[in-house]
């Protein structure tokens, strides 16, 4: 296992260009703080690209104030994936760092991420690096000192898991924690523009299949919880269209990288949140029993057990309560 915690002593003989890609839609009240955090990086070789996805507030007025310190891309509204694609197509960096416009970077973010990539060989292979984020309120107050992130052993590649179970968990944190090298960007982009929100999952899951993911055990940015976040809790809002788009994209990328297209969400335990949300209890029970019979392993059996136990405990609660509680149980099971 590779430990990325101690990268402080990693000397950068050169500092490759890092591209900060800020995607924005109607977040004018936070946008200047995101841009300022990018400009304040203590890493000298950087470019800052701000993609405005057809905002109807005063976002573009704010963008214009920064002049040639940033590279603006002003486009019609097409959703988060289209904003990602526009930014990646324009950027020149060997390191690509994504930043949601309602979040911000700490000043040493680029330096630390660049050191992590350098430690692993920069563009020697397709890599993603992610890290913890401090959770903030819309007023920039700490929320009980909590952090946001998903930890795992490094390097992580989930293709063997996906080949067996026909799906994969998203083991990567939200957009603002994600950085990728150019080699991985060339494999993943463009991503499917059917994903108008939560497009970061396409990057995260794609990297977990056709690249390697590394977790850096440091807090290098802030994630704001303000009630309108697209990522926060998005895993509990999996629509059929979204899962179909993600499945098609992942299988296409697998084929492009000479791997078998093994993803089939509806034939896996990935389908359970939607079945719960739609209150399709009989289909959920049949689905879980069928998977348990097909897989014959403790992993699937445990998931079935915790899912059915959770449903039994929910009683007459609302669908919203059902989905949230099952999400907690699934997370506990998954990390067990």
PLM region descriptions:
Residues 3-8, 165-169, 197, 209, ...:
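C-terminal subregions of glycosyltransferases and related glycan-biosynthesis enzymes
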Residues 2-238, 330:
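Nucleotide-sugar donor-binding/catalytic module of glycosyltransferases
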